[in-house]
């Protein structure tokens, strides 16, 4: 489910979407998390572990992929609140991907459908 909210520098769409985060290192470790919000600057994730600022990651949400790098990762309320600046988006064809596309429509760079 996605709700609109306006705060900070960019307006945000609140979200509650399952995501898989893959570290784009030689070991390509992955961790499950939740997309908490989406904005022009990127996405905010709730994760069980810390990611390093500057680390390259791939996010898998439904059948869509978002590529970017970690902007911050801070401990808050029993989890790490992690910001990812998104550089590229590849959208899938599922209903959830269409919902994601509507949230990303005017905020993300290079949104592509598969």
Roles of regions detected by a PLM:
Residues 1-38, 88-114:
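N-terminal helix initiation/capping motif
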Residues 10-11, 46-50, 73:
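Short, surface-exposed secondary-structure edge patches
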Residues 24-26, 40-41, 73-78:
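Short, conserved beta-turn/loop elements at beta-strand boundaries and strand-helix junctions
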Residues 31-33, 67-73:
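Short beta-strand-centered aromatic/proline hotspots
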Residues 43-47, 76-87:
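Short, solvent-exposed secondary-structure boundary/capping segments
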Residues 50, 63-66:
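Short, charged beta-turn/beta-strand-edge "cap" motif at the junction between a beta-strand
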